[in-house]
Curated annotation (Swiss-Prot):
This is Sorting nexin-3. The keyword Transport applies. It is found in: Early endosome; Cytoplasmic vesicle, Phagosome. Residues 27-151 form the PX domain. Phosphoinositide-binding protein required for multivesicular body formation. Specifically binds phosphatidylinositol 3-phosphate (PtdIns(P3)). Can also bind phosphatidylinositol 4-phosphate (PtdIns(P4)), phosphatidylinositol 5-phosphate (PtdIns(P5)) and phosphatidylinositol 3,5-biphosphate (PtdIns(3,5)P2). Plays a role in protein transport between cellular compartments. Together with RAB7A facilitates endosome membrane association of the retromer cargo-selective subcomplex (CSC/VPS). It comes from Homo sapiens (Human). Ubiquitinated, leading to its proteasomal degradation. Deubiquitinated by USP10. The modification N-acetylalanine is found at A2. The lineage of its organism: Eukaryota, Metazoa, Chordata, Craniata, Vertebrata. It is linked to A chromosomal aberration involving SNX3 has been found in patients with syndromic microphthalmia. Translocation t(6;13)(q21;q12).
Length: 162
């Protein structure tokens, strides 16, 4: 019984103030996938998504960044992580081959509903991946999230804490 009282006292010795209760979390990583834009014509047509990152994790060089990525960039990231890290990489939302067939009654992979579903799936994917401590050390993840252009000829390596 005495142990319980001591434990309770230890918990209430420091009163919480408003800054503690409503201040920013000690460590955070927020990634939003938004603002899909379809560009190009014919077979050269594709959709890009805005990737916005806000973080205070010291491993990231930028505390806020915005880049645009297409589905094939997510595929590249996934294959790099599978090849170079010990992280179990979640699946991407499906490729939607049937939506690419000609003579469909809708816009196929450029249909607004499909793009919205894919956007949500890509956001879930990147948040799961980037939230993994081992993945946060991979250079390919940092390039994907924060570099305007992905250097696909990079040398795979780990990021060291700043």
């Amino acid at each position: 019984m005495a142990e319980t009282v001591a434990d309770t006292r230890r918990l209430i010795t420091k009163p919480q103030n408003l800054n503690d209760a409503y201040g920013p979390p000690s460590n955070f990583l927020e990634i939003d996938v938004s603002n899909p834009q379809t560009v190009g014509v014919g077979r050269g047509r594709f959709t890009t998504y805005e990737i916005r990152v806000k973080t205070n994790l010291p491993i990231f060089k930028l505390k806020e960044s915005t880049v645009r990525r297409r589905y094939s960039d997510f595929e590249w990231l996934r294959s790099e992580l599978e090849r170079e890290s010990k992280v179990v990489v979640p699946p991407l939302p499906g490729k939607a081959f049937l939506r690419q067939l000609p003579f469909r009654g809708d816009d196929g992979i450029f249909d607004d509903n499909f793009i919205e579903e894919r956007k949500q799936g890509l956001e879930q994917f990147i948040n799961k991946v980037a939230g993994h401590p081992l993945a946060q050390n991979e250079r390919c993840l940092h390039m994907f999230l924060q570099d305007e252009i992905i250097d696909k000829s990079y040398t795979p390596s780990k990021i060291r804490h700043a």
